[in-house]
Amino acid sequence: VVCNFQTFEIHDMNFPNGEPEVLMLADLEKDYSRLQFLVDTGSKTIKKEMEVSLQAGELVGVLYDALLKQYKDPTAPETLKSLNALCVRLVFCLYAEDAGIFGRRDMFHDYLKNVPAAGIRKALVELFRVLDQKPEERDKYLADDNPALAAFPYVNGGLFADENIEIPPFTEELKNILLSKASEDFDWSAISPTIF
């Protein structure tokens, strides 16, 4: 909600490119109900967000446990630091493909779906490197070599800046968890992006 003391603009954050709803201050007495969402108590939306957050947490837990088993030294502090960073990156990618940040729904899923399980690790290393590079900083032949990878946008903010995180090898089970359970079967756009 934005106000210039004459008009209120109500922007729907679920549709950031949509036109705002406009409410005149002079009409507030008769149109106040249009601002009811500001004082919603115990709404279905909040309950739904909590339910989605719990489901997302369970999925991340399953993914975390499956990844942890693949590390050579699963108790080492460096391993746990890498695993945490990897999980955040994967959740971001899952969110970004569902929320349209990558430009096309299922883009992350489609990038990995035809990669054999043994090649997922390398594909993620390459993807994370590309996500951290502005288009003008990327290999000028990337689009020729790998158009699917070149199509990913630059993600600012440093989430993908550290290339030294350890990514373990993937198994068929782990690939299935990531692509089927986490990507195909769950809509990450329903979670709050503030977790990033």
Each predicted region: which residue ranges?
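Short, solvent-exposed coil/turn linker segments
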Residues: D12, E21-D27, M107, A182, ...
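Preference for the N-terminal adenyl/adenosyl cofactor-binding alpha/beta module
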Residues: C3, Y32-F196
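Nucleic-acid nuclease catalytic cores
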Residues: V1-G18, C87
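Glycine-rich phosphate-binding loops of NTPases
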Residues: P16-G42
